[in-house]
């Protein structure tokens, strides 16, 4: 994507906050130089680029079905002083959904003080169902496990209100957990 730097600059000029979702250093570097604040995603194959970016990165496993590479790469990022969030990658139903939730629990156990991100769009966009209850359940899981950032999208028609749904669900589950009440 040769014009990524230009596009990021245009968005930043209009006061948008920008992240870049690429594994390719030739896209990541110009996007960050133009003002992207967050890089999704780094793993063992491209982690060296994170050292000189000067921005936060999202660390993903080398293999989505496992947590391969996470421990080694957390050590590198911490040694380099690079801020990061860990995303064990949420899998769609039928492709390892339950196991992926287990990976989030394992990451929280291994890294109790680290920021974690969940790409909930992987479930809402890939499940042909009303997204509001799906978002509520995922935000409830995030609240209970201390996952403080989610990535959602509104591409497919059944998820076209996901951002608003997540904002409402976030408030509901936060209140429920903070006050020991049912989320209603």
Task: Give the positions of each predicted feature.
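Conserved beta-strand positions in the central sheet of alpha/beta enzyme cores
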Residues: 19, 38-41, 58-59, 85, ...
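Hydrophobic/aromatic ligand-binding patch that stacks against planar heteroaromatic rings
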Residues: 30, 49, 139-141
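Glycine-rich, proline-tolerant flexible connector loops at the mouths of alpha/beta enzymes
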Residues: 1-14
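Catalytic alpha/beta core domains of metabolic enzymes, predominantly
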Residues: 54, 61-184
């Amino acid at each position: 994507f040769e014009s990524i730097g230009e596009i990021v600059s245009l968005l930043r000029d209009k006061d948008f906050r920008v992240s870049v979702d690429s594994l390719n250093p030739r896209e990541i570097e110009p996007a960050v130089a133009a003002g992207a604040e967050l890089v999704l995603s780094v793993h063992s194959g491209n982690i060296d680029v994170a050292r000189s970016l000067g921005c936060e990165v999202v660390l993903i496993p080398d293999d989505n079905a496992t947590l391969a590479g996470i421990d080694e790469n957390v050590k590198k990022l911490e040694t380099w002083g690079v801020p990061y969030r860990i995303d064990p990658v949420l899998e769609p139903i039928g492709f390892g959904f339950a196991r992926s939730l287990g990976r989030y629990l394992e990451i929280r156990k291994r890294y109790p003080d680290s920021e974690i991100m969940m790409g909930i769009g992987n479930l809402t966009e890939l499940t042909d169902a009303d997204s509001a209850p799906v978002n509520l359940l995922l935000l409830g899981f995030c609240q209970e496990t201390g996952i403080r950032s989610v990535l959602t999208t509104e591409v497919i028609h059944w998820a076209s209100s996901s951002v608003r749904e997540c904002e409402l669900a976030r408030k509901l589950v936060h209140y429920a957990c903070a006050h020991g009440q049912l989320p209603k």
